[in-house]
Amino acid sequence: MPWSVLEALRNNPELLIESMKKRCKDPQPVYEAIRVDEEWRKTLQEVERLRHEHNKITREVAKAKDKAEREALIKKAKELLALKEELEKKLKELEAKREEILLSLPNLVHPSVPEGCDEDHNVPVRFWGKPKVWKGHLEEFEKQTKRWGFEVEHEVVEEKPVGHADMLEKVLRLGNTYKAAQVASSRFYYLFKDLVWLDYALMMYAMDFLSKKGFVLVEPPYMVRYKVLRGVIDVETFKDAIYKIEGEDLYLIATSEHPLAAYKMEEIIDESELPIKLAGVSPCFRKEAGAGNRDLKGIFRVHQFHKVEQFVFSKPEDSWEVLEELIRNAEELVKGLELPYRVVNVCGGELGSPAAKKYDLEVWYPAQGKYRELVSASNCTDWQSYRLKIRYRIKGGKKHDFVHTLNSTALATTRTITAILENHQLPDGRVRIPRALRKYLEPFESAPKDYIEPWTGI
């Protein structure tokens, strides 16, 4: 199959137009692509006509016996050749223009993606766990559950839980964002003692889980070239969110998804190798330029963090089943951490350009009284593979097709720590460590085992 966006342009342009509208974007680029493609096809037909005519006259030259007739035919052949070459040049220019427009378009939206332009239109598909709901947040809790037709069992608490930022710096005193801001800038942090152990235990937990599921653990490069970035994201939209190395064609990765996608760049994979399941383990670096003053306190939204990422190269016919597998994996991990959550089907207006469909897994934050994103799982179909030139060889033939690429968070450690601090805090200031993490701490004598304890600080 050809690239899905080009195929839609040729055979069902209305699909592209509706997809843009569903994303709450102006479909004008699609109309422009249609115009350019129609002109390209007309020009191609004219080139073919001229080629046929030139070949015909060339054969007539060989047969001509009269000198004047031969010279007239040769002159005509040269004129046709010059005209054909001129149109071939125009053809290449139109093809480049069409490609430029099509590459600027986001992916085709899957039919199951909800309508809507902002996160209020994300549709919950399931809930898990018994959240602790402060009595002052009951109305807000019902808006996030009953509004969508879900009756979620919950525990009403009289005292408002302590927010994760205050737990971090005032109660436990195991983090310091004020000093980090002096040393670096806002949205950086120092973590100490038990929280450092917890950070690495979370990574080990996710790595162990995914390796047992058949994922290959990968520690990728922490920087990528511009051509890789251009192949995996909409660079123009996100250029202010990415750290560039001054004077070099290198960018710090915002997620291991990007170098993992590029691992098979410009390759043809044998069909028998698919699916290829990778678990990326890396630090991530994000400017968070568009975050403004949101989540300035604590370590919920930061410039650097550790993350374990799921990434899959899949056959097109299997990719939607793989997406469900990825979100189920994330759910298993979060269930193991005993964190109440919901899964939402993200609406069209909230989808990033590469994603045809995305699920967010949102954990309940008792102090905030809302579900917050912990995991995102996306099917990017052939949006990335077309740009990175990743194909697979179909069994029994020479035909090649673009693979589908999928990604999902397994665990992002700092954000997961904030969820643990809010959901597992105790009245005496300690925080209960989820049982699933304890085996990754037990081998180390100085590591916490059952509880994270308040500290006097340094």
From Swiss-Prot:
Reactions accelerated catalytically: tRNA(Ser) + L-serine + ATP = L-seryl-tRNA(Ser) + AMP + diphosphate + H(+); tRNA(Sec) + L-serine + ATP = L-seryl-tRNA(Sec) + AMP + diphosphate + H(+)
List of residues binding ATP: R286, K287, E288, V302, E373, L374, V375, S376
Pathway annotation from the record: Aminoacyl-tRNA biosynthesis; selenocysteinyl-tRNA(Sec) biosynthesis; L-seryl-tRNA(Sec) from L-serine and tRNA(Sec): step 1/1
Gene Ontology biological process terms in this record: selenocysteine biosynthetic process; seryl-tRNA aminoacylation
Main location: cytoplasm
Enzyme Commission number(s) of this protein: 6.1.1.11
The protein's name: Serine--tRNA ligase
Family: Belongs to the class-II aminoacyl-tRNA synthetase family. Type-1 seryl-tRNA synthetase subfamily.
Function description: Catalyzes the attachment of serine to tRNA(Ser). Is also able to aminoacylate tRNA(Sec) with serine, to form the misacylated tRNA L-seryl-tRNA(Sec), which will be further converted into selenocysteinyl-tRNA(Sec).
InterPro entries per the UniProt record, alphabetical: aa-tRNA-synt_IIb (IPR002314), aa-tRNA-synth_II (IPR006195), aa-tRNA-synth_II/BPL/LPL (IPR045864), Ser-tRNA-ligase_type_1 (IPR002317), Ser-tRNA-synth_1_N (IPR015866), SerRS_1_N_sf (IPR042103), SerRS_core (IPR033729), tRNA-bd_arm (IPR010978)
Recorded GO MF terms: ATP binding; serine-tRNA ligase activity
Domain of life: Archaea
